[in-house]
Amino acid sequence: MARIELWNGDICDLEVDAIVNPANLSLWMSTGVGGAIKHTGGDAIEFEAVRQAPVPLGEAIVTTAGALAAKAVIHAVSLDRDRRTSGPVVDSAVRNAMARAREIGAKSVAFPALGTGVGGFPLQEAALITIRAVRDELDRSPSIDHVIFALRGAGAYRAFRAALAATADPSPSGPLAEREVVQ
């Protein structure tokens, strides 16, 4: 049974198989989550990512995790040239990030709230799109058994909690278990 977890904290601190970076088309990691990943994990992550650029909007690529606790970084291209995003792009980026995670044999994956920081996408809409996409992908492939949403701030946490509730399997023995971790 796959587990979805909400975690209030820094994605860079998580010991998981892969963390997801909300990337731009060029894969530069200067601000937001990408900047934090580069700062904590080292420049090698960005160097490896940029060598694979440009990457189409909604696609995802994998790099080393450098000095991070995670084993890999999945760069989900969710920001266009103007550093904006949309619902279909967030959906595609999440699904492709899950596909890359399966390809590298990841059992645990951590996501931030894609597109809501630099991209300025509405938090509630992003949460619902992301949770639905993750649930769909977990239903398709049981190889990933733990997805963590690393969220910063009460607003993001509430939005993802509401999205989990809105998309929950009504059967008592549903295919997913949810857990909240507040730090």
Tell where the protein language model's regions lie, with residue ranges.
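Phosphate/ribose-phosphate-bearing ligand recognition and processing surfaces
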Residues: 81-183
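Glycine-/small-residue-enriched capping loops at alpha/beta junctions
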Residues: 1-103
